[in-house]
């Protein structure tokens, strides 16, 4: 259950309706063909958890999200633009008009036709923007943008952004006839929405939070000039464009300066757009500690922990929990572990690498190929070093939060070696609930390194020899040093929790509102 006890809304924003926009929402629906019943399940991920806390705390907040196909589209069609009240405290359910729930979330679903959504999400948002922003393209061969890609941008990405903007504008006008409201947009799916909303509702307070890395101008030159200009101009419709790190915020301003020719103020971290000033800010996202602990100490988690203890005995646990996304750098992680075991045979039988991996986007060829590489890499390590009594890699392709939190509690080293990562909440989750003074082996390219790097063993994501050495340092670190590092890292995460992440954003918008 998300902790919705967010810091109070600043007085300057009291009475202003709040509209949130994200691609995924807090709940999704399925149709059970056997019973004929409609079932609902909670949305997953750090963004959904964070926004659930905010939406549940604000009585007048409405969360706008996409319904593209299946039962979600059926629910959206039945709602016909009406706001649904959804109780998320137990099994998600839509409340009647007079139904009572504990802090229900108000939801508005945007119907996006399946063909539009496929072009928007399956051609532009993921294979193009995600790859560009994580610098995953092999530029010798990809991307190779043809007329189909251009059509996908115009008829898919632009159209989906228009539909989302129309829903946001309709909600603003319904809740605030004077057009004064707070609109908080999220992530790479909706870069064009800010300017579209600004054109229709010039008096709204608009923020856009980008949850993935923002590279510099050279990376954005992968997009043709008119496409990258649409992206940047869409974001500049907002009052605040926010990122996880100062580095990403500066990179955004450099893009605005070099690709649009606008004058930026790097000291004030802002750019003037006509009569408006647009601010670039860094707000590192965090976790809902209470919700995490609720899962970590559940009956299911306790059973998983007992099973892990029985499996491991006295062995140390090296852990990673990731999606099978190429940006997570999983194959290099196995290569580094292989080198570690080759150079340090004394570790044989003394460590197990549990890799909990959730298969991701298997309809994208690069992702399907990467999952096959992962399986081959894990099998190779086991074949080279395993014995009848000990398998060095325990590969589990599943998503199980109870098991993940049990592994967080039991692990000795957590491996995060991403080539690019906006934040990486796994690092923060593990630090908070771990019971063995774990060592965080953390990529310098993960946003979490800005907060936790001082207490971690830093990894270079492309240097597997360095990663092997770092893993050895982590596994053999002095117990007292482990204890001190872990204690301080946990304090940082508990202090900078999701409530603080939300409150600093609202405080910034409140200051802008007062200055108008």
Give the location of each predicted region.
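Catalytic cores of carbohydrate-active enzymes across secretory and cytosolic contexts
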Residues: 2-516
């Amino acid at each position: 259950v998300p902790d919705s006890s967010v810091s109070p809304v600043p007085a300057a924003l009291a009475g202003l309706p709040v509209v949130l926009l994200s691609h995924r929402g807090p709940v999704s629906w399925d149709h059970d063909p056997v019973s004929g019943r409609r079932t609902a399940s909670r949305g997953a991920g750090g963004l959904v958890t964070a926004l659930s806390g905010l939406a549940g705390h604000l009585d007048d907040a409405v969360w706008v999200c996409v319904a593209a196909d299946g039962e979600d589209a059926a629910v959206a069609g039945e709602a016909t633009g009406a706001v649904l009240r959804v109780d998320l405290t137990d099994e998600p359910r839509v409340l009647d008009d007079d139904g009572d729930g504990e802090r229900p979330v108000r939801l508005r679903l945007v119907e996006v036709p399946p063909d539009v959504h496929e072009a928007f999400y399956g051609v532009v948002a993921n294979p193009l923007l995600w790859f560009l922003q994580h610098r995953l393209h092999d530029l010798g061969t990809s991307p190779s943008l043809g007329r189909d890609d251009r059509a996908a941008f115009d008829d898919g990405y632009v159209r989906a952004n228009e539909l989302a903007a129309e829903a946001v504008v309709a909600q603003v006008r319904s809740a605030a006839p004077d057009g004064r409201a707070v609109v908080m947009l999220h992530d790479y799916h909706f870069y064009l929405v800010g300017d579209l909303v600004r054109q229709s509702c010039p008096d709204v307070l608009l923020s856009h939070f980008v949850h993935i890395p923002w590279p510099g101008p050279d990376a954005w030159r992968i997009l043709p000039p008119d496409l990258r200009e649409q992206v940047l101009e869409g974001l500049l419709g907002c009052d605040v464009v926010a990122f996880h790190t100062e580095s990403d915020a500066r990179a955004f301003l450099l893009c605005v300066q070099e690709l649009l020719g606008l004058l930026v103020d790097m000291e004030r971290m802002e750019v003037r757009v006509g009569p408006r000033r647009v601010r670039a800010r860094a707000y590192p996202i965090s976790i809902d500690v209470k919700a995490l602990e609720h899962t970590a100490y559940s009956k299911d988690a306790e059973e998983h922990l007992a099973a892990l203890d029985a499996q491991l005995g006295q062995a140390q646990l090296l852990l990673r929990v990731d999606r099978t996304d190429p940006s997570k750098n999983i194959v290099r992680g196995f290569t580094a572990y292989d080198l570690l075991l080759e150079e340090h045979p004394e570790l044989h039988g003394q460590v197990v690498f549990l890799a909990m991996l959730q298969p991701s986007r298997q309809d994208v060829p690069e992702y399907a190929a990467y999952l096959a590489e992962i399986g081959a890499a894990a099998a190779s390590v086991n074949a080279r070093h395993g014995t009848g009594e000990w398998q060095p890699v325990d590969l589990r392709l599943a998503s199980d939060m109870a098991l993940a939190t049990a592994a967080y509690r039991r692990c000795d080293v957590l491996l995060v070696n991403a080539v690019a990562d906006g934040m990486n909440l796994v690092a923060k989750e593990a630090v908070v609930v771990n019971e063995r003074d774990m060592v965080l082996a953390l990529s310098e390219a993960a946003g979490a390194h800005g907060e936790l790097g001082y207490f971690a063993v830093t990894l270079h994501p492309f240097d597997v020899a360095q990663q092997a050495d770092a893993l050895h340092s982590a596994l053999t670190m002095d117990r007292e040093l482990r204890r001190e590092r872990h204690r301080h890292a946990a304090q940082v995460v508990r202090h900078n929790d999701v409530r603080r992440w939300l409150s600093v954003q609202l405080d910034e918008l409140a200051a802008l509102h007062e200055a108008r």
